[in-house]
Amino acid sequence: MEYNEFEIISKFFKNHQKKDKNQIKGIGDDSALIKIPKNNLLAISTDTLVEGKHFLKNITPKDLAYKSVAVNLSDLAAMGAKPTWITLSITMPKSDSVWLKSFSKSFFKILNKYKLNLIGGDTNSGPLSITLSIYGLIEGKNALLRGNAKNGDLIYITGNLGESAAGLSLLQKKTFLKNVKICNYLIKKHLKPIPRISEGIALRNIANAAIDISDGLISDLGHILKNSKCGADINLNTIPISKILTDNFKIDEYLNWALNSGEDYELCFTISKKNIKKLNVAIKKKIIKCTCIGYITSAEKGLNLIQNQKKIIFKKSGFNHFI
């Protein structure tokens, strides 16, 4: 069964949540009205996901809904923001009720998990794409930024790198593994990334600079270095790569995935040495799991990769939306 724009909004996206105390007006008027709490900054991020470019054509609506929200949440995590509101715009070839029901159910499930309220959006006809704008609050003025890294800072990564790329390679049938359990694990890492919201909030009073790894470590760390006017030395022997990857793939494969492939949605951040004790407290409390991979240097030294105490040549890569 097909629906028009207003029927889609009414049936699948309106009145699924209670308004929060700062939401004056949500879906149903020309604009949403929200009140920003005193002494808070509002962080805003927008992402568009296009079929065939950002997600595979055979992705289920359930997985698409989850991932579209998760990748936006990751941007808030990189700023140290607490998720609050979201808008959704869907462009789709036809208003398939079965597809919409599955999508909206998964969509509200992740929204409720992270206490996000849908406050508006749009629907249109055309090739499948999802556009989300997400809003988060930051108490005080301690937002995490890309441009605050300092010479001498230590560089850390949360979690492990490369598993999402391995999962995508399996989905695209570029890579094959006999172990079904491992295949399913890696595919899930690609389809259902975990945004590091609590880690980002905890890092507000610890880190100098941060970014989420959406386009690959080399590419995204490069944004920190460019914005901070710094260089970096990275020890490849300390890059956090899971035993699943090291046991099942060649070193060239998993190192390339870890360095150049995106969609891990882990956080890369820098801290001054004086804040190591604060970070260790967060690690001990299991708020953050992270690995030190190098340190910030002066801009003229550039970005250097060190392996077994030797500088190696590498190709700067990463995901590019216009290739």
From Swiss-Prot:
Q: Where does ATP bind?
A: G121, D122, R146, S214
MF terms (GO), sorted A to Z:
ATP binding; magnesium ion binding; thiamine-phosphate kinase activity
**Residues annotated as binding Mg(2+) 2:** D47, D75
Q: Which residues form the signal peptide?
A: none
Q: Does the keyword Metal-binding apply?
A: yes
Q: Which Gene3D superfamilies match?
A: PurM-like C-terminal domain, PurM-like, N-terminal domain
Q: Which Pfam families does this UniProt record tie to the protein?
A: AIRS, AIRS_C
Name a single GO biological process: thiamine biosynthetic process
The residues that hold Mg(2+) 5 are: D215
- Reactions accelerated catalytically: thiamine phosphate + ATP = thiamine diphosphate + ADP
Name the SUPFAM superfamilies on file: PurM C-terminal domain-like, PurM N-terminal domain-like
What Enzyme Commission number(s) appear in the record? 2.7.4.16
Give the residues the record marks as binding Mg(2+) 4.
D30, S45, D75
Q: In which pathway does it act?
A: Cofactor biosynthesis; thiamine diphosphate biosynthesis; thiamine diphosphate from thiamine phosphate: step 1/1
Binding of Mg(2+) 1 occurs at T46, D47, D122
**Keyword terms of this UniProt record:** ATP-binding, Kinase, Magnesium, Metal-binding, Nucleotide-binding, Thiamine biosynthesis, Transferase
Q: Identify the residues that bind Mg(2+) 3.
A: D30, D75, D212
Q: Where does substrate bind?
A: H54, E263, F319
Further information in the entry reads: Reaction mechanism of ThiL seems to utilize a direct, inline transfer of the gamma-phosphate of ATP to TMP rather than a phosphorylated enzyme intermediate.
Q: What does this protein do?
A: Catalyzes the ATP-dependent phosphorylation of thiamine-monophosphate (TMP) to form thiamine-pyrophosphate (TPP), the active form of vitamin B1.
Q: Which family does it belong to?
A: Belongs to the thiamine-monophosphate kinase family.
For this entry, the protein name equals: Thiamine-monophosphate kinase
The organism encoding this protein is Buchnera aphidicola subsp. Schizaphis graminum (strain Sg)
Question: Corresponding gene?
Answer: thiL
